[in-house]
From Swiss-Prot:
Binding site for [4Fe-4S] cluster 3: 125, 145, 148, 151
Domain 4Fe-4S ferredoxin-type: 106-135, 136-165
Similarity comment: family membership: Belongs to the 4Fe4S bacterial-type ferredoxin family. RnfB subfamily.
Lineage: Bacteria, Pseudomonadati, Pseudomonadota, Gammaproteobacteria, Pasteurellales
Positions of [4Fe-4S] cluster 2 binding: 115, 118, 121, 155
Species for this entry: Pasteurella multocida (strain Pm70)
Gene symbol of the encoding locus: rnfB
Protein name stated in the entry: Ion-translocating oxidoreductase complex subunit B
Region (Hydrophobic), start-end ranges: 1-28
Keyword Membrane belongs to the record: yes
Amino acid sequence: MIITTVYFILVAIAVLALIFGAILGFASVKLKVEADPIVEKIDALLPQSQCGQCGYPGCKPYAEAIANGDDITKCIPGGQTVIVNIAELMGVEPPTTDIEGDPAPMVAFIDEDMCIGCTKCIQACPVDAIIGTNKAMHTIIPDLCTGCELCVPPCPTDCISMIKVESTIHNWNWKFDPKLVIPIVDTTTTQKKLIKGE
């Protein structure tokens, strides 16, 4: 009698699970909300540093705001390049600025003599550009730093400062159109044929 009751309960639970699963599966297909594809495209253009300098909690909410008509010039780490790309995607004219090109990029710098190794800057960095361990010296990886300045306020010793990245021949962004590069062709076989008269 008890075994029959247990089997009945197990079968009833399994049937209910199948029914509710079918209802949820049907609802997920029929009631699916399609994401706005323009939001996804704008979000892909943003630098994904989630720094909040635009006034939004991350890049995805800012992309949604841009799709709803917000200003496209709020992404500081993205600079003029992101503004132009978003304007091109949205089919609008990029806003004119007083600054030619991108502003000078900034990166964080840790004065290692003052660093106490509290790891507060590591926790604040959205792109993991700071390395170090607890109670040990920390340092910045400049190639990863977006200059969002989120690591500066939590530092209890004020050992983090923002410095300009000086353009040198080694780190300058060489912008050129690969279509304009003239290929180098080996003409020695052609010259030999011309000399031999073939």
